[in-house]
From Swiss-Prot:
Belongs to the reoviridae RNA-directed RNA polymerase family. GO terms for molecular function: nucleotide binding; RNA binding; RNA-directed RNA polymerase activity. Pfam families: RdRP_4 (PF02123), Rotavirus_VP1 (PF12289). GO terms for biological process: DNA-templated transcription; viral genome replication. It catalyses: RNA(n) + a ribonucleoside 5'-triphosphate = RNA(n+1) + diphosphate. Keywords: Magnesium, Nucleotide-binding, Nucleotidyltransferase, RNA-binding, RNA-directed RNA polymerase, Transferase, Viral RNA replication, Virion. It is found in: Virion. Its cofactor is Mg(2+). GO terms for cellular component: virion component. This is RNA-directed RNA polymerase. RNA-directed RNA polymerase that is involved in both transcription and genome replication. Together with VP3 capping enzyme, forms an enzyme complex positioned near the channels situated at each of the five-fold vertices of the core. Following infection, the outermost layer of the virus is lost, leaving a double-layered particle (DLP) made up of the core and VP6 shell. VP1 then catalyzes the transcription of fully conservative plus-strand genomic RNAs that are extruded through the DLP's channels into the cytoplasm where they function as mRNAs for translation of viral proteins. Residues 506-678 form the RdRp catalytic domain. The keyword Acyltransferase does not apply.
Length: 1090
């Protein structure tokens, strides 16, 4: 499989070439801006003064002054932070560059049969008769970058590729010609200042033109060889006319193909949840029905006019080969990049609303299914009710503390002490209601008079899903119960979505563990599950019955109240109405939007598969080896006393399907011996695959991010796809970053931040210098730069005004009083900060903060000399300090063996994993394993953050006592905690979690490597000198990551030794007390917490 080899110079060099490419006309001057260490501050001031003398300065004069500066300041004492471009005259007009591509290869718009008008890619004025009807909602790419920029970036990428890979450049050029020609034919869609495409631009162009240009360019950027070229070509051409079903059609054969690889050796999960190699060998087998399904899918593709893709699928189907399976996986991943399918909500929910109810169902099965749900819920909650769990007793407080800032369904104008705010946010409504004594936990009706407003969720290759936006009372009613159920699911392996510690690798080892030639793996996609109408009545009724049984287990009034409102929420939703096109329409199904959606679906899904398997047991003799539910999907392995034959498999599959249909559940049930495909991952031939389907030039919905933030998202998405086997041109990605991070100052003046800003961990970080690994620049220069950057604080007047308002103050006070017996400053600060942070999702506040930060950054990038440094200790300081007493002793070449558990990973990562081994569990990065956290959890609904826990255990014994006392922790427990000096253990545990957090061990590739691998003992030579376990831990972890980084960057394994004395350890330990975390758009997008 082709991996694109990055012949990547430096970002700064690339950016310079890009600017020359864009500003390809006479009247341009470039000015480089530098940052230098404090002792050369004067030289920078001098340089800036000398070039700002006259009005218009020539390039030669700038260059001359720059040379003087560079001669005076040594290279290690300075770095380039930005380029300022003065461009007089016409911008390197994209349209002029496109002209040379002609119109010969242009595509033509044509309506599709059976598609709604707006889903056709036809001339906009044929869909919307006039301006007043027009909306861009169904084609809006929702990203702050334009078709022009994307074309510019693609043309530049091609011109760069011609220098080192002429053959592939020709492929890209051929594909780009189709796009350029089509743009020449219809005209370039020009966006307004908010990157929206308006009626004037679109009226005489095909409606989906902009979205098509974006997704096509994205697909071109993925082309690395003939195979990817052919896929991209076919999808680009076909997606111009088919805007509805293409992705679904192209990806549906996959379900059958995953079952067609034999297993020849695989990794399995052992009893102690580790992966080990097993040399089991299983031949594949598929039923006649599956083969027919496959041929049917291929026929549909050909009817749609596709050639290469169906031919390739069919050829592979006739002679399956593990070595070419990654090519099949590529088609599967590519299909998502045709973009989102955005439907009108009325069309999206039409199916769900018009579900026909059948009385002709198997009542026996229904009864069993219903009882299973009821018993499961009863079992989960029983002990918690008997022991009067804090979360149930204080259900209301618990819910208020974790009240999200999602929409409450109605727009209100709220006056926060003079600051007027128009918002739909739940948290703001609650604060306001409590202040005005309008707050109540009574569940409002959702009947024909108060229908539920709908939100939307768009996914490539599927229909748009509707989301209920319920009043916050529903959240309060369901929160505690749902949390308890989720916690229970964390300990039950059947719930693979929630099972704790498990990452996807573990779930994979679970499947391969039980497979053999006597076993059938059945997997079912229950995607219509939510909409199946009677299923819902039955679900809600079972929940209510379980709740009524639970109520008899306790006399606690508060818990009775909690159960009552929970039951009320179920009864209301059982017969709910939704608001579509200003009409209220009856709808009884489960819809996402409730707190319990995910966990209830899983519980019901498990009950469903158990019921169906139970019914099958009356026909066959088999053992159920495992059952797993994961969201909409369920899969199970059943072992027979005899070897599976094609006849048995076929019979079994059709029986499985018929039992599902006896319950009138519309599902796609399949069975195989060696592989399965569910929404999140697929297993084939004993190997694990993920779909690389994250869109890069399209977003699902518009949010309040600036283009700068979106550049960070773009990079993070590129990394996710690369780790899943879809490599995009890195040149293209860096070019997009260069465009999207640039800041327009005036019409003629643009500022481009450079790598030293964009790749340094500060609030402005966007990408990593080396893909897959995080580098923390550590030199005196970069630490000074980082300190200056961290002094740029984001402020928001609106947020400050709200925080000062009587409403906000009294709300925080209320939470405080309800939580603690006597006011504890640490807790009240924690609450106030959390509540204030929730305000950030309110658009005007987020915008105000970012704008403020950017305007300061712009002046910094032009003249860094006037800025004060902030004295903060960051992870860089720590690593800089450690770098002083370690040395690299030797390095050997990383062995060529690759770990093939996940064949689609980049080769260098597979080699690294083969050497160090795969990680099967996550590290505690929240401090939840510490005793202090556990004690508070037992007696209170408050969850302190890691910073707060850290602060507490480092305080005096009396302060710790006071902290516990304010949560009503019994004296006996506190005494035990203090007398056994548990806080010393906690210091270590919490700091450990904090360090894991700081070093981002759950980022990208790091989450795959076993950081506790015994291999590291050979490469980190460290004999600790002092009794400072935290410092030792910090050094060890930092060096392990250093070794991994080196493997990825250089393909070498280094051996590092530590030469520290006692004072070094103590100094490091003290430093660790004060380390602060850095948040940036980069970290927001790249860290996977849970």
């Amino acid at each position: 499989m082709a991996q694109s080899i990055v012949v990547d110079g430096d970002y700064d060099a690339l950016a310079s070439r890009y600017l020359k490419f864009v500003y390809d006309f006479e009247n341009v001057t470039y000015q480089n801006n530098y940052f230098a260490t404090d002792k050369f501050k004067k030289d920078i001031e001098q340089y800036l003064k000398s070039i700002h003398d006259g009005e218009k300065i020539t390039q030669s004069k700038i260059d001359e002054k720059e040379k003087i500066l560079l001669d005076r300041v040594p290279a290690e004492e300075r770095c380039l932070i930005s380029k300022l471009v003065f461009a007089y005259g016409k911008h390197g007009n994209v349209e002029n560059k496109l002209v040379k591509y002609g119109v010969k290869d242009a595509l033509s718009h044509a309506p599709q049969k059976d598609a709604k008008p707006y889903e056709n890619n036809i001339i906009t004025s044929e869909i919307f008769k006039e301006k007043s009807e027009y909306t861009d909602i169904y084609m809006d790419p929702s990203i702050n970058t334009s078709c022009q920029s994307n074309c510019q970036a693609m043309m530049f990428t091609i011109s760069e590729m011609k220098l080192n890979n002429i053959k592939n450049a020709a492929r890209l050029e051929k594909l780009f010609t189709i796009i350029a020609a089509t743009i020449n034919k219809y005209g370039m869609p020009r966006h307004n200042t908010r990157y929206r495409y308006e009626w004037e631009t679109m009226k005489n162009k095909p409606y989906h033109l902009a979205a098509w240009i974006n997704s096509s360019i994205e697909m071109i950027a993925c082309v690395v060889d003939h195979h990817t070229y052919m896929i991209a070509r076919e999808l680009i051409v076909k997606s111009f006319t088919n805007r509805t079903s293409l992705a679904k059609l192209v990806s549906s054969p996959m379900t059958v193909l995953t079952a067609m690889l034999p297993i020849r050796g695989t990794f399995i999960t052992t009893e102690n949840l580790e992966l080990e190699y097993s040399n089991k060998s299983i031949n594949y087998l598929i039923s006649k029905e599956m083969a027919e399904d496959f041929m049917q899918a291929i026929k549909q593709l050909r009817d749609e006019g596709l050639e290469y893709i169906p031919d390739y699928y069919e050829k592979w189907f006739k002679s399956p080969d593990p070595l070419t399976f990654p090519n099949i996986a590529l088609i599967y991943s590519f299909s998502f990049h045709v973009g989102y399918r955005k439907q009108a909500l009325s069309d999206a929910v039409y199916d769900q609303i018009t579900v026909t109810y059948s009385d002709n169902v198997n009542m026996e099965m229904y009864k069993e299914y219903s009882e299973r749900i009821e018993n499961e819920i009863f079992t989960i909650l029983k002990d918690k009710i008997i022991h009067e769990d804090k979360r149930l007793e204080e259900y209301e407080l618990s819910a208020l503390l974790s009240m999200s800032s999602a929409s409450n369904g109605i727009l209100r104008e709220i006056n926060f002490g003079g600051q007027k705010v128009r918002s739909t946010k739940k948290n703001m409504h609650v604060i306001d209601d409590i202040y005005h004594k309008k707050y109540t936990t009574d569940i409002p009706p959702v009947d024909a008079r108060n229908p539920i407003p709908l939100g939307r969720r768009d996914v490539p290759g599927r229909r748009t899903r509707a989301i209920f936006i319920l009043p916050y009372q529903y959240f309060i009613a369901q929160h505690s119960f749902a949390e308890i159920m989720l916690n229970y699911a964390k300990r039950e392996r059947e719930y693979s979505e929630f099972y704790s510690q498990a990452n996807q690798v573990l779930s994979y080892g679970d499947v391969t563990r039980y497979l053999d030639s006597n076993s059938i793996l059945c997997f079912t996609d229950v995607s219509q599950w939510d909409a199946s109408q009677h299923n819902t009545k039955v679900l809600r009724r079972s929940i209510i019955r379980a709740m009524k049984r639970l109520k008899q287990l306790t006399h606690n009034i508060n818990i009775h109240k909690a159960i009552n409102i929970y039951i009320q929420s179920q009864e209301n939703l059982e017969n709910s109405y939704v608001l579509i096109d200003k009409k209220a329409i009856q709808y009884g199904a489960t819809a996402s939007g409730e707190k319990q959606t995910k966990i209830m679906n899983s519980i019901a899904n498990k009950a469903l598969i158990q019921t169906v398997l139970g019914k099958l047991m009356t026909d066959y003799t088999f053992d159920v080896k495992m059952i797993r539910v994961d969201g909409d999907d369920n899969y199970a392995i059943v072992r027979f006393p005899i070897a599976i034959t094609e006849k048995l498999l076929s019979e079994f599959t059709s029986k499985l399907r018929s039992y599902y249909s006896e319950m009138n559940v519309k599902v796609k049930a399949l069975a195989s011996l060696t592989g399965c495909e569910i929404a999140k991952r697929y297993v084939a031939g004993g190997m694990l695959f993920f779909r690389a389907g994250v869109n890069i030039l399209h977003h699902e919905k518009r949010n309040q991010d600036s283009a700068y933030d979106m550049a960070a998202t773009l990079y993070a998405n590129y990394i996710v796809n690369a780790l899943r086997g879809l490599t995009m041109s890195r040149t293209f990605i860096l070019t997009k970053i260069c465009q999207m991070t640039s800041i327009k100052i005036t019409g003629t003046l643009r500022l481009f931040p450079m790598k030293s800003i964009l790749a340094l961990n500060s609030a402005f970080k966007v990408f990593d210098e080396v893909d897959y690994v995080i580098n923390y620049p550590i030199s005196n220069l970069f630490i000074q730069l980082q300190r200056k950057l961290s002094s740029i604080k984001a402020k928001s007047k609106i947020a400050d005004n709200i925080a000062k308002s009587p409403q906000f103050k009294s709300y925080v006070e209320l939470l405080n009083k309800s939580l603690t017996t006597d006011e504890n400053p640490i807790v009240s600060d924690g609450i106030r900060l959390t509540e204030k942070a929730k305000l950030n999702s309110y658009a005007p506040i987020a915008l105000e903060k970012r704008r403020d930060q950017f305007s300061i950054m712009v002046s910094f990038l032009q003249n860094p000399t006037t800025f004060k440094s902030e004295t903060v200790v960051t992870i860089n300081d720590v690593l800089y300090f450690i770098s002083g007493f370690i040395k690299i002793d030797s390095s050997t070449v990383l062995p060529k063996e690759e770990n093939n558990t996940m064949p689609l990973l980049p080769a260098i990562i597979k080699r690294t994993l083969s050497y160090f081994g795969l990680r099967t569990h996550d590290y505690d990065i929240k401090g939840s394993s510490s005793t202090v956290s556990k004690i508070i959890k037992q007696y209170s609904v408050y969850t302190p953050g890691i910073e707060e826990l850290y602060e507490i255990v480092n305080k005096s014994v009396d302060t710790i006592r006071g902290y516990f006392a304010s949560f009503n922790v019994p004296k006996a427990d506190v005494d035990t905690y203090i007398s056994t000096q548990m806080y010393k253990h906690d210091r270590f545990k919490i700091l450990q979690a904090y360090i894991y957090n700081l070093l981002s061990v759950n980022y990208g590739m790091y989450q795959l490597v076993d950081l506790n691998s015994a291999r590291f003992f050979d490469h980190v030579i460290h004999t600790p000198m002092a009794k400072t376990p935290t410092a030792v831990f910090m050094i060890d972890l930092a060096l392990r990551l250093k070794i991994i980084n080196h493997c990825i960057e250089k393909g070498e394994i280094i051996t590092v030794s530590v030469h520290a004395n006692k004072t070094d350890y103590l100094k490091l330990w003290r430093m660790l007390w004060n380390v602060k975390t850095m948040n940036s758009p980069y970290s927001k997008n790249s860290m996977f917490d849970e």
